[in-house]
Amino acid sequence: LGVHIPHGTTIFPGTGSPACAAWPTVIKPVRSKVALHDETLSLSVRICANATQRDEALADLLPLSPVLEQDYFRGRGFGVEVLFEHGEPRWWFAHERIHELPITGGASSYRRSIDVPGNLRKATLDLLVHLRWHGVAMVEFKMSDDGDYRLMEINPRLWGSLPLAVASGVNFPLAML
């Protein structure tokens, strides 16, 4: 499809971990929340600058969840939110992440609505049409200043920045009725 993605591999508990190809590397738990005994734990993305940090991240996370290890891509975070009906786009919205926690990349804590960048619109359209998507999705990207981008993930659900879309006049929940 020509959609750019960071190189990555999934590491499962008890399988050992392959050697890291480049630094920094990103360790993403497959699950953001896990139940442990009587509590719910939040798992977060770790950006590792060296083997020691990577080993610590894997030791912390692998007992709780498989992880995705990806090459780090420097850029700003963007979300392209869509509502598709039987493989056809009906509603579009986009936001830029102004601030993330941690600041080097993670959950967004401050965003602004933007016009959907052309290259991200094309990548989103190519992906979701190919998948014959039906319903909502938030397609997350990182984009460098020169317009090069990487797909980070597709969230097949309503997203944390939904209130920004609604406040901007793009009411996805109403459109889903």
Question: Where does each model-flagged region fall?
Answer:
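Short acidic/His/Gly/Ser-rich catalytic and metal-binding motifs that mark active-site loops
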Residues: 34-37, 100-104
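Active-site ExK catalytic segment of metal-dependent nucleases
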Residues: 28, 153-155
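A conserved helix-loop-beta module that forms one wall/lid of the active-site cleft
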Residues: 1-45
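Active-site "cap" helix and flanking loop/linker of ATP-utilizing ligase/carboxylase catalytic domains
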Residues: 115-139, 145, 156-177
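Short secondary-structure junction motifs
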Residues: 5, 66, 134-138
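Phosphate-binding site of ATP-dependent enzymes
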Residues: 46-103, 112-125, 142-150, 158
